[in-house]
Amino acid sequence: MSQEFNEIDANTIETNYDNVVYSFDDLNLKPNIVRGIFGYGYESPSAIQQRAILPITEGRDVLAQAQSGTGKTATFTISALQRIDENLKATQALILAPTRELALQIQNVITHIGLYLNVTVHASIGGTSMKDDIEAFKSGVQIVVGTPGRVFDMIERRFFRTDKVKMFIMDEADEMLSSGFKEQIYNIFRLLPETTQVVLLSATMPQDVLEVTTKFMNNPVRILVKKDELTLEGIKQFYINVEQEDFKFDCLCDLYDSISVTQAVIFCNTRSKVEFLTTKLKAENFTVSAIHADLPQSDRDTIMNEFRSGSSRILIATDLLARGIDVQQVSLVINYDLPANKENYIHRIGRGGRFGRKGVAINFVTDEDVGMMREIEKFYSTQIEEMPANIGELFN
């Protein structure tokens, strides 16, 4: 499977590190990593990989601003695998992610790219058996991918010994720091060896993220995509003025009458709205799955697998799941509610066109939402057009 990336023009990247490597063969990687990279479907590095893998494998602190669909997960996966001492049975790399789903996806990428290496990886996440965590740490698992709460708990209980950790990677740092994990993350930082390398990936650079860079990073290499380039290429963005909340559902049904879509993700701002919309759509005979943070992990896994396999055509989700829904065939994202946090907009609509695939995002905008939509346009230097009457043609 060949991987395509959203093209990023070199002129849109600001960096204080000038070494750009255009081939995986020139990155001085272990031969079995290169074998795993090609086996996974990568042919040449994406823009972020060309610039970030080398400084990370050299042990430098790195701050990379990259959105979904740019190959950022493989960037730190490849780098972590390169830095692991395969003979040392102890945790050497810690990767934090804001959601369980994202942590499991990262674990999956590490497993695939590290297929030909003797490296162990474990996901330490909430909603799973603590016994599995304890056994993994006792066995000397080398890479841990986890969510902040569970990881901190394991460190506090002294099952996770941090003395051999040489790499700390934070993915979606902006989301983690704004989601109430800040204190746990700071506590984790303080329990790691002082010499630990820090790699931070974030789609946006709010104050919380910049604060971490000054407190915990040492002269980091910065690779920043300019803000006005952050909206994913290939996503057509539209809005429908629904005037008021009560009109949204009828509008959604009308929309489905006029388009033919394989699969869609619909985002709502609250769990209660997700449940309300699911019930209403099922009553209209739509095949719908719903997913939110309060569901048990096993249910969430089942629902995601159903959606990936195509047995469910519509996935309704809250913002927590905006990061980590990796479904290749999604061609339409509907923001039933505009996100309350404008920085989440990119993560929602980015689902529709991962790795350069085209996608359509449709925003339902009430009269009260117009101001927020203008803020989103300004924040991303983008334009959200009114939905044309011939919208169906985009899906033929």
UniProtKB/Swiss-Prot annotation:
Q: Which keywords label this protein? A: ATP-binding, Cytoplasm, Helicase, Hydrolase, Initiation factor, Nucleotide-binding, Protein biosynthesis, RNA-binding
Q: Where is the motif (DEAD box)?
A: 171-174
Gene Ontology, cellular component aspect: cytoplasm
> Residues in domain Helicase ATP-binding?
53-223
Q: Can you tell me which residues bind ATP?
A: 66-73
Catalyzed reactions? ATP + H2O = ADP + phosphate + H(+)
Q: Where is this motif: Q motif?
A: 22-50
Which GO molecular function entries does the Swiss-Prot or TrEMBL record give? ATP binding; ATP hydrolysis activity; RNA binding; RNA helicase activity; translation initiation factor activity
InterPro entries, alphabetically?
DEAD/DEAH_box_helicase_dom, EIF4A_DEADc, Helicase_ATP-bd, Helicase_C-like, P-loop_NTPase, RNA-helicase_DEAD-box_CS, RNA_helicase_DEAD_Q_motif
Location comes to:
Cytoplasm
Record domain Helicase C-terminal: where:
234-395
- TM regions (residue ranges): none
According to its UniProt record, where is this protein mainly located?
cytoplasm
- Alphabetical list of Gene3D superfamilies matching this protein: P-loop containing nucleotide triphosphate hydrolases
Q: Which family is this sequence assigned to?
A: Belongs to the DEAD box helicase family. eIF4A subfamily.
Q: What is this protein called?
A: ATP-dependent RNA helicase eIF4A
Native organism: Meyerozyma guilliermondii (strain ATCC 6260 / CBS 566 / DSM 6381 / JCM 1539 / NBRC 10279 / NRRL Y-324) (Yeast)
Q: What is the lineage of its organism?
A: Eukaryota, Fungi, Dikarya, Ascomycota, Saccharomycotina
Q: Which gene encodes it?
A: TIF1
